[in-house]
Swiss-Prot record:
This is Macrophage receptor MARCO. The lineage of its organism: Eukaryota, Metazoa, Chordata, Craniata, Vertebrata. Residues 193-216, 376-386 have a biased composition (Basic and acidic residues). PANTHER family: COLLAGEN ALPHA (PTHR24023), MACROPHAGE RECEPTOR MARCO (PTHR24023:SF1083). The keyword Transmembrane applies. GO terms for biological process: innate immune response. Residues 153-166, 273-286 have a biased composition (Low complexity). Residues 146-386 are annotated as: Disordered. Residues 70-483 are extracellular. It comes from Mesocricetus auratus (Golden hamster). Pattern recognition receptor (PRR) which binds Gram-positive and Gram-negative bacteria. Also plays a role in binding of unopsonized particles by alveolar macrophages. Binds to the secretoglobin SCGB3A2. It is a single-pass type II membrane protein.
């Protein structure tokens, strides 16, 4: 196919070159005709001019016919080469032929052969216009009829011709004879300071530096000074003893005694046998934060032991005798502030006072030293975990029941399928389940219209009606078979 197109293109270019040679041979003959030829002195000049005009018209007609044939052949060749659909209408083809004759042709401008052909067609058209203009000038020349006419107006400037093809590079000239070096010229003036150059490109990213050494551990902070204890006021003198009054109502609880001084820390004793839990004693004062000790080695995790038995409840003590109410003494004169006394012996523990308001959260204490690792306890007995669902009537097959509101109840079989049964069985430790109707239950019917996806961990996460809302009887109780 490509060879056929190449042969057609070469044949067309050959015909175009022959037409161009014919035009070049024809037009120089036409151009040699001079308008201002000297008039012969013969009397038959008019018939000679008529014959010349007839010859020119015949040649012009022949050239136009040849040009039309070339345009038609060019149109046919372009239709065969560049248009796959050959069903163009006649009016489209005539319009296309006019476009080919126009100097503003845009047919495949990127093909070198068509560009050369377009240049040749433009030259032919320009030569034809010049020929028509010369013939028109011959017919309108008054000197042919020995009548001097008026000077004509200047003609319209012609269209600008297409740019010529770039000529080949000329031969390199011979190298000139060497000359003696000229005298050294005077140094030129100092040039102006150049403008600041553009900012350079950002350099490549440097390599990561080595990781620095770990810093030394800081010293522990010093312990702050303890604040001064407030001075207790002087107690007033005791009043005279009054008459014994009637037994009064139980008095308010006494004030809590001051906490005793913290004793020195004893050495850790041997681990004793765990005894029964005693009664809760009063909370001691907050100890001073100890210095942080070195971290001890991490011991293996011991097995959780069984919870100890609950201790027996102690018996209620006897109510003490109500003391006599003394008269209120006069307020003494506040004495001078004395020196800070020595720490007294710890007093007896007073009755438990009412719980005070919760104090502000204290600052976190420093981490204490790690205690010695305790002995490994005995393995406790396995406890029974409470299940929120159960199977009644068999180990893994039976009626499905669920525990809610401190009571067991059944599930209605409306929309009960294998996905719901799988979630139910998963709550009992199985991997899958199968749902069906079992019936025979009693008591509450807790769930109805359960709609699980099969991926939930509990029936509480599934879509369902409200607890206790149903329209079923116990003959519709749901059953499961867990696997």
């Amino acid at each position: 196919m490509g060879n056929k197109k190449a042969l057609k293109e070469e044949a067309f270019l050959g015909s175009a070159e022959e037409g161009a040679d014919f035009d070049q041979a024809m037009f120089p003959v036409m151009e040699t005709f001079e308008i201002n030829d000297p008039m012969p002195k013969k009397r038959n000049w008019g018939s000679f001019c008529t014959a010349v005009m007839a010859i020119h018209l015949i040649l012009l007609t022949a050239g136009t016919t040849l040009l039309t044939l070339k345009v038609l052949s060019l149109q046919k060749w372009i239709l065969e080469k560049y248009l796959d659909n050959e069903t163009l209408a006649a009016e489209d083809r005539s319009f296309f032929s006019l476009q080919l004759a126009s100097p503003e042709t845009h047919l495949v401008p990127r093909t070198p052969g068509l560009q050369a052909l377009q240049v040749q067609l433009t030259q032919v058209r320009t030569s034809q216009e010049q020929l028509l203009q010369q013939v028109d000038n011959l017919t309108r020349n008054p000197e042919l009829f020995r009548i001097k006419g008026e000077r004509g107006s200047p003609g319209i400037p012609g269209l600008q011709g297409p740019p010529g093809i770039k000529g080949e590079a000329g031969l390199q000239g011979p190298m000139g004879a060497p000359r003696e070096p000229g005298a050294t010229g005077a140094p030129g003036p100092q040039g102006e300071k150049g403008s600041k150059g553009d900012k350079g490109l950002i350099g490549p990213k440097g390599e990561h530096g080595t990781k620095g050494d770990k810093g030394d551990l800081g010293l522990p902070g010093s312990k702050g000074d303890m604040g001064m204890k407030g001075v207790t006021g002087v107690m007033g003198p005791p009043g005279a003893q009054g008459n014994k009054g009637d037994p009064g109502k139980p008095g308010l609880p006494g004030l809590a005694g001051s906490p005793g001084v913290k004793g020195d820390q004893g050495q850790p004793g041997l681990q004793g046998v765990p005894g029964t839990p005693g009664a809760a004693g009063p909370s001691g004062a907050k100890g001073e934060p100890g210095h942080p000790g070195p971290p001890g080695p991490t011991g293996p995790q011991g097995i959780s032991g069984s919870p100890g038995a609950a201790g027996l409840k102690g018996s209620k003590g006897d109510t003490g005798i109500q003391g006599q109410k003394g008269t209120k003494g006069e307020s003494g004169v506040p004495g001078l502030a004395g020196r800070k006394g020595d720490t007294g012996n710890p007093g007896l523990a007073g009755p438990k006072g009412e719980p005070g308001r919760p104090g502000l959260k204290g600052d976190p204490g420093m981490k204490g030293s790690s205690g010695q690792q305790g002995q490994k306890g005995e393995k406790g007995e396995k406890g029974q975990s409470f299940k929120e669902v159960r199977i009644v009537g068999g180990t893994n097959r039976g009626r499905a029941e669920i525990f809610y509101n401190n009571a067991w109840g059944t599930i209605c079989d409306d929309n009960w399928d294998n996905n719901d049964a799988t979630v139910f069985c998963r709550m009992l430790g199985y991997s899958s389940g199968k749902g069906f109707t079992f019936g025979g239950g009693s008591g509450n019917i807790w769930l109805d219209d359960v709609n699980c996806q099969g991926t939930e961990d509990s029936l509480w996460n599934c879509r369902k009606n409200n607890w206790g809302s149903h329209n079923c009887n116990h003959n519709e109780d749901a059953g499961v078979e867990c696997r």
